[in-house]
Curated annotation (Swiss-Prot):
Membrane-spanning ranges: none
Protein name as it appears in the record: Serine/threonine-protein phosphatase 2A activator 1
Naturally occurring in which organism (per UniProt): Aspergillus oryzae (strain ATCC 42149 / RIB 40)
Domain of life, source organism: Eukaryota
Gene Ontology BP term (one): mitotic spindle organization
Gene assigned in the entry: rrd1
UniProt keyword Nucleus present: yes
GO cellular component: a single term: cytoplasm
Phylogenetic lineage: Eukaryota, Fungi, Dikarya, Ascomycota, Pezizomycotina
């Protein structure tokens, strides 16, 4: 739904006066082709709606007197509601469990086994944690079917999915997605107070999501968790994605309630995107900005030149059109690299709040490019000339054939480095040339609030090669 008179779509809430049947969440994404169905589902639309709603709230605000209000971390301009404070207490208790679970002695090939002990503690404590955090009318909202479960079964699924995989001892964007969905489920159950547009959303981001990310970083560092579904050097980040979305919004141009989310520009005094490559800038900005907070964590756990271990983020730091351009690109990339990737969404489960049912206005995906990472029921023919490849998404989207082969001697230089460049960062453009465009939010009557990457122009000519490989210009490219 759209907020009255505002260019923003808002995640709908349940009407308490109407019946609702809750469902035990179930796995629906079992093969690559199921991702296409997911991208047409009500769950997908609701996830993107909630993400865009939160994103908009983090842009600086134009005040009636002409001043600009920004939303840095730990700002006193944001007051937390009672539900947000309850969620903060929940996170604090999980942190206490972390402190009370020391590392196991010995050598571990992957993550330390104490992670599984901590994970078991969180699971055991979940019923009481949710009961203390959420009002009974939210947690135990009944189904209209007398034999149906309460809302607790759906809330528990998304909450437990937020803390990494006990079996694989890893953490990635799929777990981050589960926490976002947990908060979205509370929203749909009317668990957050009604307020002016953006007010409560802002408290959710600053008061719950950022503390959650900080807690997860502590878990990752303590137990040395593996990244789940990482693209390696070609990925954006080994573990997280949403801090780059909200953090770039924090530095975007100021907007009023009637403005559309901007696609270019920055705050007049915003730090330059190139600041991510400067350690002193990162240390300063990580205290006030979510984007730089995530960059700071990368610097904490990775060694070597930033451009070498985080090439995607290094490339993005060369964007000249401002933080709003980066924000738009991040949302597009989240859609393509998280929600459209089988390895990420295969573990997501669907109930009534985030439903597998098809959205009536869904537009079928134009390409199967995002499903190629998953198993298929029908074998696909591989051309005899095709060489073995590590898989979709592991190669930089802008890489050419000549770039795919690493330098023969050093082994540590950037893939595009030449013998003259040595170990120095490249001096050519760092802007990726293309990314998959998998936008799916429908146009129609709500065109002003559709996904920010959606184009009103007709599609261009089909690319050469595989007709299924539909790509568009990178969101931050000029």
């Amino acid at each position: 739904m759209a907020a009255d008179g505002l260019p923003v779509r808002v995640l709908p809430t349940l009407d308490p006066s109407e019946g609702h049947t809750f469902l035990e969440p179930s796995k629906r994404i079992n093969e690559g082709d199921d991702v296409s169905e997911f991208l047409c589902s009500k769950a997908y639309v609701d996830i993107m709606t909630f993400l865009l709603q939160l994103n908009r709230s983090m842009f600086p605000a134009k005040l009636p007197d002409g001043r600009v209000q920004t939303w840095p971390l730990n700002t006193e301009a944001v007051g937390f509601s009672a539900p947000v404070r309850q969620l903060q207490q929940l996170l604090s208790k999980i942190e206490d469990l972390l402190d009370a679970t020391p590392l196991m002695p010995g050598e571990w090939r992957y993550a330390n086994g104490a992670f599984q002990v901590w994970h078991d503690k969180v699971k055991k404590a979940t019923p009481s944690l949710l009961a203390e955090c959420l009002p009974a009318e939210i947690l135990h909202a009944p189904s209209s079917d007398p034999n149906g479960p309460t809302a607790e079964v759906e809330l528990t699924e998304y909450f437990l999915g937020s803390w990494g995989s006990r079996e694989r001892m890893d953490y990635g964007t799929g777990h981050e997605l589960s926490f976002l969905t947990f908060l979205g489920a509370i929203w749909k159950l009317n668990g957050f107070p009604k307020n002016e547009p953006g007010v409560e959303e802002r408290t959710i981001v600053l008061g719950v999501i950022e503390p959650y990310l900080e807690l997860i970083r502590a878990v990752i560092k303590k137990y040395k968790l593996e990244p789940a579904g990482s693209h390696g050097v070609w990925g954006l980040d080994d573990h997280s994605f949403i801090p780059y979305i909200f953090g770039s919004a924090q530095l975007g141009p100021a907007i009023s309630n009637s403005d559309l989310v901007p696609e270019t520009g920055s705050l007049p005094d915003a730090v330059d995107p190139d600041g991510v490559t400067k350690a002193n800038v990162v240390e300063k900005e990580r205290k006030v900005n979510m984007y730089f907070s995530a960059i700071g964590f990368i610097n904490d756990v990775k060694k070597g030149p930033f451009w070498e271990h985080s090439q995607m983020l290094y490339n993005i730091s060369g964007v000249q059109a401002g933080w709003a351009k980066i924000n738009k690109g991040m949302i597009k990339m989240y859609n393509a690299e998280v929600l459209s990737k089988f390895p990420v969404v295969q573990h997501f489960r669907f109930g009534s709040l985030f439903s597998w049912n098809r959205d009536p206005s869904a537009i079928p995906p134009p390409s199967r490019i995002h499903t190629s990472s998953g198993p298929e029921t029908r074998p696909r023919q591989v051309p005899p000339s095709a060489r073995q490849d590590p898989g979709p998404g592991t190669k930089a989207p802008w890489a050419t054939a000549s770039q795919s082969t690493p330098p023969p001697s050093t082994g540590t230089a950037a893939p595009w480095a030449t013998s003259r460049a040595g170990r120095e960062p490249p001096t050519t453009s760092r802007i990726p040339s293309a990314l998959p465009d998998t936008s799916r939010l429908p146009p129609g009557p709500m065109a002003p609030t559709r996904a920010p990457w959606a184009s009103s122009q007709p599609a261009g000519p089909a690319p050469t090669g595989d007709p299924n490989d539909i790509t568009t210009k990178a969101p931050w490219a000029k």
